[in-house]
């Protein structure tokens, strides 16, 4: 049988999912569904993940992250409420800042954190990709001594950053800067506009980081918004766009601006990115001799065979007809893009 406390938590949970008119806000205040001068709301995202929303976290927080914020504020009613709604009370010990709150969380069941607990919590709290969530992750976890010497956490962040063509040496920056760049790059990867602006305004000294991440994560919209504010050679930008396979949007954008598509083709061969290679051919690249020689030097029989059918490949007129840097038009053009040259290769290679 449910206890009065659990029934009360359930009623509050149901109430928090309802649309409540302003004249009935007093009910929410009375029930403790009130945070920073506004109602607390519960919702789920497209992945059916539970989110906390409020006036200052309007696009949603992970429930565990909301708990960590309530702990930082020593808000005991919300600590208890979020725990009853399913937040992991152990995560509260990351942001606890008073002995009284520490004891309160321990009474609710919080366990002493070990390294694996911290890594697990780190993973959980940024599953929800919203501006509110990423910004609060940054605010709550920056300059935390608890995080400084956890090797597993450093490995996770370094592995993520190493996938981006970084313009610095990871071993020469602090862990806190690593973590900040991690959140900043995630904001760009998921095109979280508010979070991008937040990091851009506060970390302008991270030279070209926004541009590098936009190119790397195929975010043509943010690239278009930001490109006039930076000074970078267009071929260098194309090179950065080619550092991941299937980055069609940003490769096309750089191509329209005048980047050398033959150099992009050679880069695709060096990286063994066949999708980028065919896309470059579709855009008119014809550096077949150099590419074939490079493939042979690398003893890459797959690329050598692919390039041997050069006489059967041709550029894609529909791609070449659109000379625009408008992100919406580029997205529409490439939304269902499939290379006809790949289809030709597959037919020829089966003969």
From Swiss-Prot:
InterPro entries assigned: ASFV_MGF360 (IPR002595)
Membrane-spanning ranges: none
One GO biological process term: taxis
Source taxon at top rank: Viruses
Stated role: Plays a role in virus cell tropism, and may be required for efficient virus replication in macrophages.
Similarity comment text for this entry: Belongs to the asfivirus MGF 360 family.
Protein name: Protein MGF 360-2L
């Amino acid at each position: 049988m449910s206890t009065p406390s659990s029934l009360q938590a359930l009623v509050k949970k149901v109430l928090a999912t309802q649309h409540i008119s302003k004249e009935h806000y007093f009910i929410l205040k009375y029930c403790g569904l009130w945070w920073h001068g506004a109602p607390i709301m519960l919702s789920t995202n497209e992945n059916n993940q539970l989110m906390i929303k409020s006036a200052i976290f309007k696009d949603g927080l992970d429930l565990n992250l909301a708990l960590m914020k309530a702990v930082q504020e020593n808000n005991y009613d919300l600590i208890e409420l979020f725990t009853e709604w399913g937040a992991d009370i152990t995560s509260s010990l990351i942001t606890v800042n008073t002995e009284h709150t520490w004891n309160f969380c321990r009474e609710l069941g919080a366990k002493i954190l070990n390294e694996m607990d911290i890594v697990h919590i780190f993973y959980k709290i940024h599953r929800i990709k919203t501006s509110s969530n990423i910004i609060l992750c940054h605010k709550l976890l920056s300059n935390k001594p608890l995080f400084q010497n956890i090797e597993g956490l450093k490995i996770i962040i370094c592995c993520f950053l190493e996938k981006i063509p970084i313009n610095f040496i990871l071993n020469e920056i602090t862990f806190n800067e690593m973590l900040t760049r991690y959140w900043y790059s995630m904001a760009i990867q998921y095109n979280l506009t508010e979070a991008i602006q937040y990091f851009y305004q506060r970390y302008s000294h991270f030279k070209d980081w926004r541009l590098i991440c936009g190119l790397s994560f195929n975010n043509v919209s943010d690239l278009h918004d930001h490109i006039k504010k930076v000074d970078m050679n267009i071929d260098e930008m194309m090179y950065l766009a080619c550092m991941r396979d299937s980055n069609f949007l940003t490769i096309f954008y750089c191509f329209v601006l005048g980047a050398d598509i033959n150099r992009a083709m050679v880069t695709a061969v060096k990286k063994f990115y066949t999708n980028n290679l065919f896309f470059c051919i579709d855009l008119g690249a014809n550096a077949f001799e150099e590419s074939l020689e490079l493939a042979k030097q690398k003893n890459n029989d797959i690329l050598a065979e692919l390039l041997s059918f050069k006489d059967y490949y041709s550029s894609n007129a529909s791609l070449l007809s659109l000379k625009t840097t408008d992100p919406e038009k580029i997205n529409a053009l490439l939304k269902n893009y499939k290379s006809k040259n790949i289809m030709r290769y597959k037919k020829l290679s089966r003969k």
